[in-house]
Amino acid sequence: MEWSEVEVHTTNEAVEPVANVLTEFGAAGVSIEDVADFLREREDKFGEIYALRREDYPEDGVIIKAYFLKTTEFVEQIPEIEQTLKNLSTFDIPLGNFQFVVNDVDDEEWATAWKKYYHPVQITDRITIVPSWESYTPSANEIIIELDPGMAFGTGTHPTTQLCIRALSDYLQPGDEVIDVGTGSGVLSIASAKLGAKSILATDLDEIATRAAEENITLNKTEHIITVKQNNLLQDINKTDVDIVVANILAEVILLFPEDVYRALKPGGIFIASGIIEDKAKVVEEALKKAGLVIEKMEQQGDWVAIISKRGVE
């Protein structure tokens, strides 16, 4: 088989939106080369340091590589893919020194290239995300989430995902009922299940995302707790007594449904909203307040913000 590699040079803030666009166009795998990953401390709790090479990383920004079967349909779609990526700037997503290049690669190269950039990520002192092909020995009481990031719908390495998992770790109580809006890889649903949630509804509008979520949920043996549904946000979801709603999606999308979140939550229920670029945080905060939610706190990692709000006790 012939494969094409789409290489995009952009900013860290644009990683997840760009990766999601590429996957929606049919990418079979995505790798992310971020110089910040090389520069930050990579020592784990066993004193091991991952052997990463500086030459594998860009001088600045992020390089995202996506792999497509080189079909006639793909070749015809190349201009549309490039334009869709450029259009992300209309959502105030900074693309930086945007570059878009298409190369041919052999079958073996695309299948393994991205694996060297993805290693276990310790999110909290309790939760670690581990790629499915790596052997990892957890410590006592450590929660392990296994992911195959080939579909690139949230690998746990992005700040927005980490902010959500930390908030879930802080607020989720055993026996809680959770809705995960825009589930992507299913990582937040899996984290919720392993933190003790009784039942979780994971929704995503994208069919590819729901398939990726189902595969990862099965990998983590949490399918008896998590139900995956292809759905547009909370549309036609009639739950009204939910403990936690979590959404790791763009601010512009969060603004579409705060009233629906309020209706879904029970009194005292928590809404964890991430995927919010710093410049949009105030707008989202005001929309949540207008819907009747009370802001509990805001957490920030880099340029990304998570807002934790609550439905008041009536």
Swiss-Prot record:
Disulfide-bonded cysteines: none
Keywords: Cytoplasm, Methyltransferase, S-adenosyl-L-methionine, Transferase
Compartments it resides in: Cytoplasm
Main location per the UniProt record: cytoplasm
GO biological process: methylation
InterPro entries to which the protein is assigned, alphabetical: Ribosomal_L11_MeTrfase_PrmA, Ribosomal_PrmA_MeTrfase, SAM-dependent_MTases_sf
Alphabetized CDD domains for the sequence: AdoMet_MTases
Pfam family, one: PrmA
Record-linked SUPFAM superfamilies: S-adenosyl-L-methionine-dependent methyltransferases
Record bears the keyword Cell inner membrane: no
Signal sequence region: none
Gene Ontology cellular component annotations, sorted alphabetically: cytoplasm
Gene Ontology molecular functions: protein-lysine N-methyltransferase activity
Binding site for S-adenosyl-L-methionine: 161, 182, 204, 248
Catalytic activity: L-lysyl-[protein] + 3 S-adenosyl-L-methionine = N(6),N(6),N(6)-trimethyl-L-lysyl-[protein] + 3 S-adenosyl-L-homocysteine + 3 H(+)
Assigned EC number: 2.1.1.-
Job of this protein: Methylates ribosomal protein L11.
Family in the record: Belongs to the methyltransferase superfamily. PrmA family.
Protein known as: Ribosomal protein L11 methyltransferase
Organism listed in the record: Listeria monocytogenes serotype 4b (strain CLIP80459)
